[in-house]
């Protein structure tokens, strides 16, 4: 395909225009008075959301240079979402502010590499200041406040805090397993069930059943546990046929699934003949065997292993485990409500406790405690209901974000919310870090950009951004604007806080992309095809698949 190339100012301005288009659509959602954005879908009802990364994913621009600019900012939102689970809109607003100020200085003759170094040094100092200011989360009320802000509903925040305590063994734990399900009832209900999550995802992306969320959801599946590798489909075929006749999906957990066995499962999944997901077993060596046995006890199945005289060819349905639901992403697998007996699970838990007491190795004890938490902790299920499907999807998305937000708060602590932590951390840059020239310019760009989230929150609340930023900069540490009612308060005392992990990630990712923008000297893009040239001749007549 032919390419088009833009250089210098033309290249950077094209990228900036794409960034601004995306950022302007996203930033209206920031803060308690933020608005919603309606996203049209190819089929079904439109989605209404105030989640930055969801909005960013939907934006596709026509101009090739603008499209690249928008894609770069999408990366900021996606990376922040992946790392922290929230803060995507803040990251986008920061990126826009950094790029706008940076390009203005580059156009005026500043050296982009000097500015880049200044930005990096300033961000490192601000990050350090944020981590120093962070307070550890110690109470259920603090988690409820953090999650409640993310979900824009204090009642949901309280349910999430309750869920974290319920499956964390009576204490806050960032590894608490909390899933969100759609329900036919109104409101949000909490249910704690037997279950487990381990950090292995699907072997092939083709197993995903929900392409938008890139996850595979199996309802009431059989679970096949195998200690070795599966590569020969002939070994697996007799069991597959029995599972197919039962009409249930199948989750396979083994050392690996490869070759013709994997390709057969994928082809049948794509054709809709048989729904299955293959996942690598967690751990290595003896730990893998032990964890497979944990899953077997939890699901009421048996591990197929030659050590106990069981083989795939002779395996039957009674050897398979079962669960109410299994959710598999690219990174982890969650088993909800396994069919194992209470007595066997309790016996396994006691056995692990004895092993912990008898172990001399700190590392072994740590791994055994992880297994104990997974087996004994269970899974908290938040069931979400709403009047319409559109509202239900939006609510579910908000709650999932709030859960990840709460976990981030437990992990690294919390700082004052509402954009105030960033603005007040900017004081560390007051003397330009004693740098000079273009590096000092980079520091000043960061200092100015750190006011952008607070200004946007104020603007969305109908207040004058400059006046609010000036007022907050003069307030004592931790005090700032409560945009919900327009009052200036002690934000931590009022329960208005953000996980420092979210704030830190938003700044670091925004600065990373801004540095790329400023140091770009050429952009190579695909040349747009003339209208009507994109379709292949005869594709319609052949059904678009060559007649197969």
UniProtKB/Swiss-Prot annotation:
Protein name: Chaperonin GroEL 2
Location(s), subcellular: Cytoplasm
EC number annotated for this UniProt entry: 5.6.1.7
Annotated CDD domains: GroEL
Keywords: ATP-binding, Chaperone, Cytoplasm, Isomerase, Nucleotide-binding
One example of a Gene Ontology biological process annotation: protein refolding
InterPro entries: Chaperonin_Cpn60_CS, Cpn60/GroEL, Cpn60/GroEL/TCP-1, GroEL-like_apical_dom_sf, GROEL-like_equatorial_sf, TCP-1-like_intermed_sf
Oligomeric and partner information: Forms a cylinder of 14 subunits composed of two heptameric rings stacked back-to-back. Interacts with the co-chaperonin GroES.
